[in-house]
Design a protein with these regions (language model features):
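Order/disorder boundary and secretion-linked terminal/linker segments
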Residues: 397-492, 523-561
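Glycan-processing catalytic domains of CAZymes
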Residues: 19-411, 484, 511-514, 522, ...
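Hydrophobic h-region of N-terminal signal peptides that target proteins for export
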Residues: 8-18
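Sec-dependent signal peptide recognition
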Residues: 2-8
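Residue-level detector of short, conserved catalytic/binding motifs and their immediate flanks
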Residues: 51-53, 131, 165, 334-336, ...
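Residues within well-ordered beta-strands of beta-sheet-rich folds
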Residues: 56, 136, 168, 450, ...
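Short, surface-exposed tryptophan/glycine-enriched loops
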Residues: 498-513
């Protein structure tokens, strides 16, 4: 099947058959490993015009050295007392190791230039409904090597009709000497000649840049951008945007008094270790000394730290932040800024290597430490898996609302269009000890999948970029989740193998064609394990991960709007 844009495909389908319905974000469902379900249109309410969600996105993996990886969580698993042992062989030489990892991402210790990873990130953002990526350039680097790979991928999906996130640079706060060179660089690289202008995040009619406006910029730069000042804590001036939510969440306002944005964060910044504590490593950091209370890490809620096993999987602190943002008194705020997707790294500062901070302990870990004291949403290997991603999906849905899902009447077809390109092989270096990451499991790539019901049977069809291969047990698998049935370990009640089209009698599923019903489904090709997380990594899946497509059938009334 030749590649078509989302819009052209849907137009062709509609012109050929007036009973064909394009799916939308409301036709996604699923649940995380904790049993928390993706909220539906009935729970979110209708679309809230003008509301958007931004996500802090990091470009720095491998850009400051590829030594390692040195994973603090794995070091502590090997020796629980390693934080108090500066001479432990588990520690690298801080003079030659600028960065440590707090944990392992699902896609491995990747470099930000890995396009295989970038495509998966973009797919996840499309499915979540993210509107803008804020690039963390607060340390004086803008990482052009990475954005030169990211922007063409975003543009490709945009040109095919997918709603991709826009981009915005978030520069250094005032105290870090936010100068003009970084702004000039991104101006010359991407803005001056209107390169990737489809992807600019617009605010007040101009591309937004978060940096200090009172610098000696060129007049053409001052005229081109809408400026907002950066800070990490509650702003004291108007036209200042922040991401930290400390010491308490608040709403940033413009100079005209208009409420503009609010922050939502996984945990407070500076969840770091600086000195021995009774709970070794669990929350002594700058924030404790500044705000005179325990660090509010992932498991903090109702004024205390939840110490139950796996408490860090639930995103308790994040949920409190989300609930605050969603309160009725903040319905007029148009933008929520979520911190964050993928920091993963922490500068390795010790008494030997540090020249920035007055240290109270031999090691200083600023902002990240381990699974509990970190703030990334991107799925990880083990640990919280993809729970924070699906929590983010739910927040976006509640913040922005949802359209009515596509509903099929008798004989109608619902089409679900897939973002292709993610089945290309992976062949890219990771951190030094990882060598080259490879993945050649992509075989049958889904272009779109369709479902119809004539009142007696369901017809599922998968169209692939190339003619499908159906030679393996894991080839062209269809998974169904039918209400009232007990799902298996993967989360499904029925499996079908090795075909691109399945006609399934409703009676086989216990469904009645005279009644309205809903079911969830997923297509998968060449998975490597019976693990829901494998749907993110190997082969192709429509949709990826724990998300499923939602098919809604109503014999009395299809969605013909």
């Amino acid at each position: 099947m030749r590649k078509m844009s989302v819009l052209s495909l849907v137009a062709a389908l509609l012109s050929a058959d007036a009973a064909t319905r394009p799916a939308n974000l409301a036709n996604l469902a699923g649940e995380d490993h904790l049993g928390r379900k993706i909220v539906s249109r009935a729970e979110t309410g209708p679309v809230k015009p003008g509301r958007q969600v931004g996500l802090f996105y990091y470009l720095w993996m491998g850009q400051h050295g590829t030594q390692g990886p040195y994973d603090i969580s794995k070091m502590e698993a090997a020796d629980p007392d390693v934080m108090d042992k500066p001479d432990s062989p588990l520690w690298p030489d801080s003079a030659h190791t600028p960065m440590l990892h707090w944990g392992e991402p699902l896609f491995g210790y990747y470099l930000s230039t890995d396009e295989w990873v970038i495509r998966r990130h973009v797919e996840m953002f499309i499915a979540a409904g993210i509107d803008v990526l804020y690039f963390d350039t607060t340390n004086g680097y803008h990482y052009r090597e990475v954005t030169d790979r990211l922007f063409p991928i975003l543009q490709e999906y945009h040109d095919r009709g997918f709603k991709v996130p826009k981009f915005c640079y978030y520069m250094a706060p005032n105290r870090r000497g936010s100068g003009t060179s970084n702004v000039l660089d991104v101006w010359l690289n991407y803005y001056k000649d209107r390169k990737f202008s489809d992807l600019y995040f617009m605010w007040d009619g101009k591309p937004l840049i978060v940096t200090h406006p009172d610098r000696p910029y060129r007049q053409e730069i001052l005229d081109f951008f809408t400026f907002r000042r950066p800070t990490w804590c509650t702003p004291s001036k108007p036209d200042t945007w922040y991401w930290g939510g400390m010491p308490t969440q608040n709403v940033a306002v413009a100079s005209n008094g208009r409420r503009e944005m609010l922050p939502v964060t996984v945990s407070t910044p500076h969840a770091a270790m600086e000195s021995p504590t009774p709970q070794r490593g669990r929350g002594i950091g700058a924030s404790e000394f500044r705000w005179r209370k325990d660090v509010q890490s992932r498991s903090w809620h109702h004024g205390r730290l939840d110490t139950r096993e796996n408490a860090s999987h639930y995103g308790f602190f994040l949920q409190e932040q989300m609930d605050w943002a969603l309160a009725p008194e903040r319905e007029d705020v148009p933008l929520a800024f979520v911190c964050q997707w993928n920091e993963w790294l922490v500068p390795f500062l010790t008494e030997k290597s540090n020249d920035l901070y007055k240290m109270r302990h031999w090691i200083h870990l600023m902002d990240e430490y381990n699974m509990e004291s970190s703030r990334d949403i991107e799925p990880m290997k083990g640990g919280f898996q993809d729970a924070y991603y699906l929590q983010l999906v739910n927040f976006v849905r509640r913040w922005k609302g949802l359209p009515d899902p596509a509903v099929a009447g008798k004989g109608d077809t619902v089409v679900f269009v897939e973002p292709t390109g993610d089945c290309a092989p992976r062949n890219h270096p990771g951190y030094d000890a990882c060598g080259v990451y490879t993945n050649f499991t992509g075989r049958n790539e889904f272009a779109d999948v369709c479902v119809s019901c004539d009142g007696t049977k369901l017809v599922f069809t998968a169209n692939t970029v190339k003619p499908p291969l159906c030679d393996r047990e894991t080839s062209m698998n269809l998974f169904l989740r039918v209400p009232g049935k007990e799902p298996d370990a993967l989360g499904y009640t029925h499996r079908y193998r090795r075909a691109a089209r399945y006609e399934i009698p409703l009676a086989d599923l216990g469904l009645d064609g005279a009644q309205r019903f809903e079911l969830q489904f997923k297509w998968s090709d060449n998975r490597q394990a019976d693990d829901p997380m494998d749907f993110y990594v190997n082969g192709d899946a429509a949709p990826r991960g724990r998300l499923n497509y939602l098919f809604v059938y109503d014999p009395q009334q299809g969605n013909r709007s």
